Amino acid sequence: MAEKLMKYADATKKYDVVFGLETHVELSTNTKLFCPAHIEFGGEPNTELTPVSLGLPGSLPVINKTAVDYAIKLGLALHCEIAEWSQFARKNYFYPDMPRDYQISQYDKPTNGNGYLDVELEDGTVFRVPIERAHIEDDAGKNTHVGGADGRIEGADHSLVDYNRAGVPLIEIVTKPIEGAGDRAPEIAGAYVRAIRDIVRALNISHARMEQGNMRADVNVSLRPSPDAPYGTRSETKNVNSFRGIEKTIQYEIRRQAARLDDGKEILQETRHWDEATQTTAGGRLKSDADDYRYFPDPDLVMLHITKEHIEEMKAQMPEMPRERRNRLKSEWGLSDLQMRDILNADALDLIEETVKAGAKAAGARKWWLGELSREANAKGVSLEELPITPADVAEVEKLIASGKLNDKLAKQTVEGVLKGEGTPDEVVKKHDYKIVEDNGAIEAAVDAAFEANPDVVEKLKSGNMKPMGVIIGAVMKATRGQADAKAVTKVVMGKIKG
């Protein structure tokens, strides 16, 4: 039975929204956090295992130094205080994807704490998100529930477990309760998680592909009658794996909780699940406080000591951060805020920058990646990066246009050839013998034929009405297979009209 919902505008006027996010980022190390097992997305199930990742008796964990360095870099990017001494703890719970029956995480002594991230919203407003901690932990295995209607455990015939992911290093970034967002809570949440994605990619510490599960978020939402009232009971929607899903989860939970509070009903402290098909959250298990997990220091791991000298080494390796990079490129390329936002929304900044580095002008690169190539990616249901065309290819097409060897139509056909796997732009041009027709004799013959086929258009042109000029130019382009130079065609047409 569908839950009662309050209108979103009414809910955010009547109640003060408080939300929080726990963002799990899988680190792109070569091996797991506490053992030398290799990490590979989509590999054969249960092939990348060691006694440590299976939790076999007598196996002892050894920390992955690269994972620690990645955590330090992320802490620096999030303006965190980096602890000189931090500690791993056992988080105890029973579930089939956790063969040890505990997760190695950090509890009261995390590596990174007390940070913040400034996120820019659609209208240019900057909102500061407070960060409680960014701690290191290992991931669980992956359950696949077979036989049910929607892939969930309810209604499944049986479950399969792949332990390849067990032990993969994660950083969990936990915000403090985020207050003052009001009706912009979903937008702020989406902008924040996108900013985290951009930062970890810039640091080159994670692929951060939500569709592959190496970045996901738990979404906490509660309501209270006013900003000075105590926090309300929160729900926690687990493992939301899309930016849109995070935004929709917050919006739905605000509406659901507001309707329950209005009816005098209790808000349960529970875990919930976001259902993409129905665009709703569904209740899971009741959730108590962290004490349920019986955290205690892991006796197999000594405390982690990070010296000030090592932190300085990591600082020296920090790249330009995404926000500073965006502002620099916006200035270099002469873009408006709206134009830069279009690039970011299309996830095309890296591709456009690489195209410019390969020799194209920014305007031309932006035209291709946000236009023809975005349409192609949407039609195929893939990302721009997954298209079989490189920034160097796009730059080569732009150079062919600039040198006068291709017009816009031939350039489009060349790009289509590259996408079909016919080779590089130069190879496609040679294969199809694409070239601009500059022979005035051939152009004049095509114009004469177009005039003869469209006498009414010719009369309008001669009377000074230039609106139907496109009919003649289009006919000439069709006759020359798009190879005529548009400027040359226009010149011939104007000469014949005036003559």
Swiss-Prot record:
Its EC number is 6.3.5.-. Disulfide bonds: none annotated. Coiled coil: none annotated. InterPro entries: Asn/Gln-tRNA_amidoTrfase_suB/E, Asn/Gln-tRNA_Trfase_suB/E_cat, Asn/Gln_amidotransferase, Asn/Gln_tRNA_amidoTrase-B-like, GatB, GatB_C_1, GatB_Yqey_C_2, Gln-tRNA_amidoTrfase_suB_CS. It catalyses: L-glutamyl-tRNA(Gln) + L-glutamine + ATP + H2O = L-glutaminyl-tRNA(Gln) + L-glutamate + ADP + phosphate + H(+); L-aspartyl-tRNA(Asn) + L-glutamine + ATP + H2O = L-asparaginyl-tRNA(Asn) + L-glutamate + ADP + phosphate + 2 H(+). It comes from the Bacteria. One of its GO terms (molecular function) is ATP binding. Keywords: ATP-binding, Ligase, Nucleotide-binding, Protein biosynthesis. One of its GO terms (biological process) is translation. Heterotrimer of A, B and C subunits. Allows the formation of correctly charged Asn-tRNA(Asn) or Gln-tRNA(Gln) through the transamidation of misacylated Asp-tRNA(Asn) or Glu-tRNA(Gln) in organisms which lack either or both of asparaginyl-tRNA or glutaminyl-tRNA synthetases. The reaction takes place in the presence of glutamine and ATP through an activated phospho-Asp-tRNA(Asn) or phospho-Glu-tRNA(Gln). Belongs to the GatB/GatE family. GatB subfamily. This is Aspartyl/glutamyl-tRNA(Asn/Gln) amidotransferase subunit B.
